[in-house]
Regions:
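Flexible, acidic/histidine-containing loops and adjacent segments that form or flank the divalent-metal
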Residues: 19-20, 24-155
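A local structural micro-motif
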Residues: 6, 81-84, 201
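N-terminal catalytic scaffold of extracellular/periplasmic and nuclease hydrolases
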Residues: 1-8, 36-37
């Protein structure tokens, strides 16, 4: 489409349908700043998820996702100006243009350092199958969300966050909702929709 540079690229979490295209993007597009809930160690190598590691299938799947994410960072790191790991303990506010601002919202703050410790251990070769399975199941729980403000309108991008993680004061009314997690029942509850009161909703069904 003629795009050769992105000022900011935000990754919400590490499931294949959210980071699987990162390599293809970085092949042809430079990125000023990559925002992510986890940045692999600079010297990290391939995880070899399908090697003879004795891990159960669910744990291997987590390693595949992390390899799919970390691989392009190794190959195309020179195409990224800066990688910023978001701490997860406070809302991040960005002014994207004079008219457009964005809040990045997180799940439970305690999730992110725990998740970081498990992923760091995996890249060091310390692979605890139980921990990997647990955090594989928790990827959606720790998914980032965004709220954009443009000329008096508010647009909420729900990522894959589960509804119970933000049926709180952060779920205030909006104009447009990008429905979380393909409108799954665990992420799009009646309570959440009552809180958000969107005038329009967009659903992704072909991830």
């Amino acid at each position: 489409n003629g795009v050769t540079h992105l000022d900011i690229l935000l990754l919400t979490h590490f499931h294949r349908d959210h980071i699987g295209g990162l390599g293809r993007v970085l092949e042809t597009v430079t990125v000023g700043e990559l925002l992510t809930p986890y940045a692999p160690p600079a010297d990290s190598g391939p995880l070899d998820p399908d090697g003879d590691n004795g891990l159960p299938k669910a744990a291997r799947n987590v390693l595949r996702c992390m390899d799919l994410y970390a691989g392009p960072l190794r190959r195309y790191g020179d195409r990224i100006g800066r990688i910023k790991e978001l701490p997860g303990d406070r809302m991040e506010c960005l002014r994207l243009t004079d008219d457009l601002t964005m809040d990045i919202l997180f799940g439970e703050p305690a999730l992110y350092p725990r998740q970081r410790a498990v992923y760091d251990a995996a890249f060091r070769g310390e692979r605890n199958g139980y921990d990997l399975i647990h955090w594989g199941k928790s990827m959606n729980v720790s998914s980032l969300r965004q709220r954009l403000y443009y000329h008096g309108k508010e647009i909420v991008l729900g990522g894959d966050a589960y509804a119970h993680m933000w049926e709180t004061q952060t779920a205030t009314p909006c104009d447009i909702l990008k429905v979380p997690h393909h409108a799954s029942l665990s992420s799009t509850t009646r309570k959440l929709l009552r809180l958000l009161q969107p005038k329009a909703a967009v659903v992704c069904v072909a991830a």
